[in-house]
Amino acid sequence: MTTKSKHIILSLTFLLLFLSTVFSSHVTQRFTSSDDITELVVTALNQTISNVNLSSSNFSDLLQRLGSNLSHRDLCAFDDCLELLDDTVFDLTTAISKLRSHSPELHNVKMLLSAAMTNTRTCLDGFASSDNDENLNNNDNKTYGVAESLKESLFNISSHVSDSLAMLENIPGHIPGKVKEDVGFPMWVSGSDRNLLQDPVDETKVNLVVAQNGTGNYTTIGEAISAAPNSSETRFVIYIKCGEYFENIEIPREKTMIMFIGDGIGRTVIKANRSYADGWTAFHSATVGVRGSGFIAKDLSFVNYAGPEKHQAVALRSSSDLSAYYRCSFESYQDTIYVHSHKQFYRECDIYGTVDFIFGDASVVFQNCSLYARRPNPNQKIIYTAQGRENSREPTGISIISSRILAAPDLIPVQANFKAYLGRPWQLYSRTVIMKSFIDDLVDPAGWLKWKDDFALETLYYGEYMNEGPGSNMTNRVQWPGFKRIETVEEASQFSVGPFIDGNKWLNSTRIPFTLDL
């Protein structure tokens, strides 16, 4: 039996057992009300949380058992899983809290469940390279059996969350209302944050200063993050003065509402060189990893300088909900930005890469950004995006609006030697749209690339709408069932800032132009 077959059977078994248990106490009652279905979902999620906690405990036990026998990448994979399972418990607990509120926002609940599914898949991704790893597979049979059982438990958890996501569809009135059109920042960017984004740096209005020359509170960014308060409900601003900071930065989940302000792209630079080739998982390779919600970055560069031969080497990994990046650059080659999960927004940013250089399963909008393809390795294809939506009910995807898809200076002289594509489907329901953007002539007339064989060609959603430039001609685009020539503003608008990242309430106009809708 294949792993996929086991996954399907486990999913169906769980759903049947769960429903029979719940319905046994309501034999004569029809579950038609919102409250009934909500209680079904809450019961399912509570059981899933118990399963996640058990899996986390088993992962810890196995890690202790294997200890020094593990390769560095396998150690990273275990660390990834323990962190991601902890995040999953948090996401599911938050989802339950929102469901039980007086006016649950089901779009946000779906985002949380989507993030939980992404977490389990990311955990599995970390072990993908371990199938042939002697340190893991050539341990005693009992240990190997436990490892395989843990992998199966992750499939099971993801399946349970998927079932809950399906049940949400049956709650009456779950369809979000019409979005109000306005101009401004998203509702989760407050008035004071808006001023911080617009105005020059005033050191009297920041909480901490990082400076390599000793003129600030700290000389490293890591020290400043450690000094920031936990679970802050107000903005905590860290001004990072001009300089190159060779650090791998992790902003943990408890460090909320952090804001980085630099002195400009190329002037304030955070850089490191972890990579898959050097024994790191893609998740752990990030120069900067952000988990704490409400993160904002302005006027700085995130760089992974591992190089094109090192494979996955992430500059930024963000699972920060309601995070925003303004006038920043992100520079690497393969897997530059890992838009891992939750809702994110990028404005006037420059992104440099070669292969899948924007990837992940967040709900993310790139507006007025420039995507630069760099010179890849010989015979390598250039792919701008690889979106990771694995369930048709996930509200996730990559939306690129009013942006520029270009060749970087190092590619321009030799771009005729390489083929470039807008994206390829990393997962079954991959979803990416490009709207009102300039697409240069480096993009192949087909536009999009297969992942492998016919995988996801019928289930993906790749859309283009009112683009311009020599690469925007759709005459010879792929003929896949999932490719869409978006023809109406109604269809296109669902991927605009308002509906797509839940920006249904906005602030008034600001000095930074920001269009809510198309």
Curated annotation (Swiss-Prot):
It is found in: Secreted, Cell wall. Substrate binds at residues 312, 424, 426. Residues 1-24 form the signal peptide. GO terms for molecular function: enzyme inhibitor activity; pectinesterase activity. Expressed in flower buds. InterPro entries: Invertase/methylesterase_inhib (IPR035513), Pectin_lyas_fold (IPR012334), Pectin_lyase_fold/virulence (IPR011050), Pectinesterase_Asp_AS (IPR033131), Pectinesterase_cat (IPR000070), Pectinesterase_inhib_dom (IPR006501). Residues 207-504 are annotated as: Pectinesterase 40. It catalyses: [(1->4)-alpha-D-galacturonosyl methyl ester](n) + n H2O = [(1->4)-alpha-D-galacturonosyl](n) + n methanol + n H(+). This is Probable pectinesterase/pectinesterase inhibitor 40. Its EC number is 3.1.1.11. The PMEI region may act as an autoinhibitory domain and prevent untimely PME activity during transport. Its main location: secreted. Glycans are attached at residues 46, 53, 58, 69, 141, 156, 213, 217, 230, 273, 368, 473, 508. Transmembrane segments: none annotated. Pathway: Glycan metabolism; pectin degradation; 2-dehydro-3-deoxy-D-gluconate from pectin: step 1/5. In the N-terminal section; belongs to the PMEI family. In the C-terminal section; belongs to the pectinesterase family. The active site is at residues 335, 356. Gene3D superfamilies: Invertase/pectin methylesterase inhibitor family protein (1.20.140.40), Single-stranded right-handed beta-helix, Pectin lyase-like (2.160.20.10). Acts in the modification of cell walls via demethylesterification of cell wall pectin. One of its GO terms (cellular component) is extracellular region. SMART domains: PMEI (SM00856). Keywords: Aspartyl esterase, Cell wall, Cell wall biogenesis/degradation, Disulfide bond, Glycoprotein, Hydrolase, Secreted, Signal. Pfam families: Pectinesterase, PMEI. It is an enzyme of class 3 (hydrolase).
